[in-house]
Amino acid sequence: KEEFLPELDFKLTETDLINMLLEEINNGMDGTDICPGVIKCGTSYNNITETEVKIIKAAAKVHTLTGIPVSTHCDKGTMMLEQGELLVKNGVKPENILLGHTDVQKDLNIQLEALKRGFNILTDHVGRELDNIDEDRIRKIEIMIREGFGGQVFLSGDMGKKDYVTAYGGRPGLDYILGV
């Protein structure tokens, strides 16, 4: 998502981004020996900017060189089909793509279309009752399973803020999914 990108991402070429990612994959991130197991990219709300296209193409190229799967950020559940198709056009097989935040998309038909195209989708706002509530998520997942897509639906709690961690007085807590 462009608004959260570091300034460097706007300046680097696609080739520079590819080389930077390969360096981290082969030698570790931030001076450590910890190597990534997934490549992340994303898009803005209802839009894919030129910089985001450059990053998605770089992520796709790195995937084709390494086999590391690609996980995406679909801002408020938008642009999932476009992200997936851009990755496929640049060499990523649909089964190696995990489209994130798809449960925020209110139109179940868009989620089903992503699944029909072979993409994996991430229901990761579980416990975060923003625009959708968990009962709606469960209902949609039941439909996806009945349609034969159960193996392509992933559950997660996108709980990256203190507001969601019980140790800081937040809710629902990191163990929420395990308890429901």
Q: Which residue ranges define each predicted feature?
A:
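Structural preference for beta-strand elements that scaffold enzyme active sites
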Residues: P36-V38, G67-S71, N96-L98, G118-L122, ...
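Acidic (Asp/Glu)-rich catalytic clusters
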Residues: E24-I34, K61-T64, V88-G91, Q111-G118, ...
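Charged helix-capping and loop-helix junction motifs
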Residues: V53-A58, D134-E142, G170, L174-Y176
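Active-site beta-loop-alpha junctions enriched in small/polar residues
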Residues: K1, S44, D75-G77, T102-Q105, ...
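Short acidic/histidine-rich active-site segments
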Residues: D124-H125, F149-G170
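Active-site glycine- and acidic-residue-rich loops that bind
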Residues: L99-Q105, D124-E142
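Distinct, well-ordered alpha-helical segments
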Residues: E50-V53, T78-G91, L108-K116
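Active-site gating/metal-coordination segments in enzymes
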Residues: K1-T64, N120, H125-L130
